């Protein structure tokens, strides 16, 4: 019998319980075991997890045994990935995360989890939290008040499709080093409010789809956002159909190259002031205001479109727009104008006149 403890994962014989151990008893356990570092593919997915095409539907419970507290993992990435029927994880107090640097996809597609108590987590060394809670569709509450995010650089898709979350308190988040926030709240369709006033976004380069599908948000204060390094804002607010107003007067878009579908299906927006937008580097504007059906006016006379290649469906479905000033639009590089004004039935005044042929 080995006298050196090892970290391993044990699957019970009925295949319903996954237990994490750090002891010398692995050989004596019935059922299947894997070493904590065993992987199943070149992507680094742990050997006990499943893939998206064939998620695990037998494991109901995961347990961290008391012995596991003596182990010091440096990664917990993908540990519960695609355990679709996992209902509870017990013994979080027995996992020591003081040396963990990567928590990417840790709970990815754990769609049956309704609650997670991570108050014992030490995240002071974690650099990657991308996709961490993605597809946790049944989570109704998530307390991250103990999270130290000072070293995190990737929060992309962190809460993607957490469809049942009605509130999320991130007031303690330090985002000073974060570079990726794309899809961070994508599909959080039950969130009614979101306070990000403490967010430092000075290093963020990607906000693509950040709030897309947050269909219950009635307001969003982004006055503290520094967007001076952001290159992609495509789909950023797409599907935020309950937003009636959006103040982006502080947005620096001088580095932006993608604004496609940025406000797509923001059906309740009645006004949108983009007078401060610098679009001199933007290449994609397709679907930018798609079905913004409550907008009555939009002044884009200052838009520099000299690098834009795609304007297809840009104003499609803007049924309440009565006038649109595009007098400064340079369409020399545009190769796609298909459906640009489709469904703009109230649009009677369009400047310049050459655009009227697309009505």
Predicted segment positions?
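Negatively charged
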Residues: 1-359
